[in-house]
Amino acid sequence: MAREFSRTRRVGQQIQREIALILQREVKDPRIGMVTVSDVEVSRDLNYAKVYVTFLQLENDAERIKEGLKALTEAAGYIRSLLGSAMRLRVVPELRFFYDQTLVEGMRLSNLVTNTIREDKRRMAESGREEDDAAPDETTEDNA
């Protein structure tokens, strides 16, 4: 019977919290800037951890993201050593950093939906139809 939260998931959540604190308090590299640890996936044998991060910035600058990931990769050994002293694990996972695209993709999809709704309203206004006319009333009364 599978448990609701496996050990690897619990370890991943703890690693996420610890790395967030380490990045906030210990790592002083200006290339990293404001970074958020959005998720950590740990391998079943706890030897590797994929750390998904997002960078707080005004626009999505691919060069700054690449530079931030490079800085995190260079600091991975230091972060791993601090992680080892903060957590009681027999093996501290090797850290691999990845940029988390979900926030950017979510914003892109939200903008697409907003633009589609705006375009539909504009087309209805041009054709002289009201919003209420676009969807006929589907409610019927039952005489039962």
Curated annotation (Swiss-Prot):
InterPro entries recorded: KH_dom-like_a/b, RbfA, RbfA_dom_sf, Ribosome-bd_factorA_CS
Cellular localisation: Cytoplasm
Annotated keywords: Cytoplasm, Ribosome biogenesis
Pfam families: RBFA
Domain of life, per lineage: Bacteria
GO CC annotation terms, alphabetical: cytosol
Region of interest called Disordered, as start-end residue ranges on this chain: 120-144
The keyword Repressor is assigned to this record: no
Biased composition range(s): Acidic residues: 129-144
Single biological process term from Gene Ontology: maturation of SSU-rRNA
UniProt entry tagged with the keyword Cell cycle: no
Molecular function per GO: ribosomal small subunit binding
Subunit structure: Monomer. Binds 30S ribosomal subunits, but not 50S ribosomal subunits or 70S ribosomes.
Record-stated family: Belongs to the RbfA family.
Annotated HAMAP family: RbfA
Matches recorded under PANTHER family: RIBOSOME-BINDING FACTOR A, CHLOROPLASTIC-RELATED
Function: One of several proteins that assist in the late maturation steps of the functional core of the 30S ribosomal subunit. Associates with free 30S ribosomal subunits (but not with 30S subunits that are part of 70S ribosomes or polysomes). Required for efficient processing of 16S rRNA. May interact with the 5'-terminal helix region of 16S rRNA.
Protein name: Ribosome-binding factor A
Gene: rbfA
